[in-house]
């Protein structure tokens, strides 16, 4: 299990480096998918299966749609590829930063890292499912605000990417 988690953590950092080096928006989309999948895999290994599924569906369903519009807006005739020197040096610098940060973190203790089901013997329900009831009861106002902000973001992206044509909002 420790090898599995170490592999997932390394893949998470590699995906983040792929997004940060960002040779072109098309290649960064692959990094986003890797980070979303690996992050949800880490959540599953710590016992948050429901939360992991919800985050994966929301992230890939919502954010990649907005990312597709941004990639269409920033279309380049000759995008930088992974084999270019500039991208290679960016990856090397980010990798060096990760190695230095890992050196600092490995000298201390692990902090407050614990599983979601650490006290499952004393609980009747799972910890990640109980957050759903809280989201719809006490967090209902915040849920409506977040839905409104996401709808507004979608309209902003549609307006920005429409160019000189009349766009989608004319039909609404």
Curated annotation (Swiss-Prot):
It is a multi-pass membrane protein. GO terms for molecular function: NADH dehydrogenase (ubiquinone) activity. InterPro entries: ComplexI_Subunit6, NADH_UbQ/plastoQ_OxRdtase_su6. It catalyses: a ubiquinone + NADH + 5 H(+)(in) = a ubiquinol + NAD(+) + 4 H(+)(out). It holds the Pfam family Oxidored_q3. The chain crosses the membrane at residues 1-21, 24-44, 53-73, 86-106, 140-160. Keywords: Electron transport, Membrane, Mitochondrion, Mitochondrion inner membrane, NAD, Respiratory chain, Translocase, Transmembrane, Transmembrane helix, Transport, Ubiquinone. GO terms for biological process: mitochondrial electron transport, NADH to ubiquinone; mitochondrial respiratory chain complex I assembly. The keyword Transmembrane helix applies. It is an enzyme of class 7 (translocase). It is found in: Mitochondrion inner membrane. Its EC number is 7.1.1.2. Core subunit of respiratory chain NADH dehydrogenase (Complex I) which is composed of 45 different subunits. Belongs to the complex I subunit 6 family. Core subunit of the mitochondrial membrane respiratory chain NADH dehydrogenase (Complex I) which catalyzes electron transfer from NADH through the respiratory chain, using ubiquinone as an electron acceptor. Essential for the catalytic activity and assembly of complex I. This is NADH-ubiquinone oxidoreductase chain 6. The lineage of its organism: Eukaryota, Metazoa, Chordata, Craniata, Vertebrata.
């Amino acid at each position: 299990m420790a090898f599995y988690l170490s592999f997932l953590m390394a893949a998470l950092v590699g995906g983040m480096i792929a997004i940060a080096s960002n040779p072109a928006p098309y290649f960064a989309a692959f990094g986003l998918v890797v980070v979303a999948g690996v992050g949800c895999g880490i959540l599953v290994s710590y016992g948050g299966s429901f939360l992991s599924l919800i985050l994966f569906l929301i992230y890939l369903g919502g954010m990649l749609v907005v990312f597709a519009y941004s990639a269409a807006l920033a279309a380049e005739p000759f995008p930088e590829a992974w084999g270019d020197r500039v991208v290679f040096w960016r990856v090397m610098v980010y990798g060096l930063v990760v190695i230095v940060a890992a050196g600092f973190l490995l000298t201390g203790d692990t902090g407050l890292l614990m599983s979601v089901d650490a006290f499952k013997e004393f609980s009747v329900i799972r910890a990640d499912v109980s957050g759903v009831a809280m989201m719809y009861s006490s967090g209902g106002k915040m849920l409506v605000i977040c839905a409104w902000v996401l709808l507004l973001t979608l309209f902003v992206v549609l307006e920005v990417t429409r160019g000189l044509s009349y766009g989608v909002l004319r039909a609404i």
